[in-house]
UniProtKB/Swiss-Prot annotation:
Quaternary organization: Forms heterodimers with AGL30 and AGL65.
Organism listed in the record: Arabidopsis thaliana (Mouse-ear cress)
Cellular component GO terms held in the UniProt record: nucleus
Tissue: Expressed in pollen.
Database matches in Pfam families: SRF-TF (PF00319)
SUPFAM superfamilies in UniProt: SRF-like
Result of knocking out the encoding gene: No visible phenotype under normal growth conditions. Pollen grains from the double mutant agl66 and agl104 have severely reduced viability, delayed germination and aberrant pollen tube growth.
Name of the featured protein: Agamous-like MADS-box protein AGL104
Function per UniProt: Probable transcription factor that forms heterodimers with the MADS-box proteins AGL30 and AGL65 and is involved in the regulation of pollen maturation at the late stages of pollen development and pollen tube growth.
């Protein structure tokens, strides 16, 4: 009984289709191998299984090279070389553009592979990198030379021209720095002044009073309360402070015919003499103004003859006490 001829049509069962492909694939690859060895030809075999697994075979020449030869053939030769077992089917390629695109991609990948495997191409890339490194080193050296202009080494100078050029460069740089500083100060002057200003705690009244205490020169006497200050300096300071008061009191006493109270200083080395005038009428007038709403006026309570009390000086009192002492001493001695 003979072998049943298999009908050539698509196998509907997926498992049977995969098994049939595995069996016939091995036989097809074996036939291609035998053909490439026996006939010494360039052969390329590409297959995709029903599960989209790729199977490749090539003889002594790579698949990329075989396809490159196919692309370089004229169009007529490629069309005439197509072989169809079914003679009723005319050669027709529906997706010719797609095939050409795939072949071009394969050619590009082939060129890349050749460049990688070719040592000459690698050496050319290394040479380009070396040239780039040299160029960057030159730029770095030029930048270092520019920086050395701002820190010149006088030992390296051999002529006066080099000194003059270096001096001019430094002066120009200094000018630019000063201009930049002035620009920044002009822009930030308002904020700088606001941060450095301090408010006056005492106010204008206290400042005027303190300035009145100081001499006319306006110098700040930092040694005012210094214990180590010399007596002459203290005397000069006190005279400068109380001289306006003495002048004012003496002028007012001369105008109003008032008596003065003089205090004599027996130790004149330490402190100078000073005098202060008091007016009895002015004193009572001020007291009367302060106590107007409290009771009757002082002038009504006092007699008319006591309205003006003569001033008694300290010198008169001292003389009177001395005279009394001189009269009492003989009396005590006689007893």
């Amino acid at each position: 009984m003979g072998r049943v001829k298999l009908e050539i049509k698509r196998i509907e069962n997926t498992t049977n289709r995969q098994v049939t492909f595995s069996k016939r694939r091995n036989g097809l690859i074996k036939k291609a191998y035998e053909l490439s060895i026996l006939c010494d030809i360039d052969i390329a075999l590409i297959m995709f299984s029903p599960s989209d697994r790729l199977s490749l075979f090539s003889g002594k020449t790579r698949i990329e090279d075989v396809f490159s030869r196919f692309i370089n053939l004229p169009k007529q030769e490629r069309e005439s070389a197509l072989y169809f077992p079914d003679q009723n089917r005319r050669p027709d390629i529906q997706n010719k553009e797609c095939l050409l695109r795939i072949l071009q991609q394969l050619k590009t990948e082939n060129d890349i592979a050749l460049q990688v495997t070719n040592p000459a191409a690698i050496n050319s890339d290394v040479e380009e990198l070396e040239h780039e490194v040299c160029r960057l080193q030159q730029q770095l050296q030029m930048a270092e030379e520019e920086l050395r202009r701002y820190e010149p080494d006088p030992i390296r100078f051999t002529t006066m021209e080099e000194y003059e050029v270096s001096e001019k460069q430094l002066l120009d740089t200094l000018t630019h720095v000063v201009q930049r500083r002035d620009h920044l100060m002009s822009n930030h002057l308002s904020s700088y002044e606001a941060s450095t200003m301090q408010p006056n705690i005492g106010g204008p009244f206290v400042n005027d009073v303190v300035e009145g205490w100081l001499p006319e020169n306006g110098t700040n006497q930092t040694h005012l309360f210094d214990a180590s200050a010399h007596s002459n300096q203290l005397r000069e300071l006190s005279s400068a402070m109380y001289e306006p008061l003495l002048q004012g009191s003496s002028s007012s006493s001369n105008q109003n015919n008032m008596s003065e109270c003089h205090v004599t200083n027996h130790n004149g080395e330490m402190f100078p003499e000073w005098a202060q005038a008091y007016s009895s009428s002015a004193l009572f007038a001020s007291m009367q103004q302060q106590h107007e709403g409290v009771g009757p006026s002082i002038e009504e309570m006092m007699p008319a003859q006591q309205s003006d009390i003569p001033g008694v000086t300290a010198e008169t009192q001292v003389d009177h006490e001395v005279s009394d002492y001189e009269t009492k001493v003989p009396q005590l001695s006689s007893q």
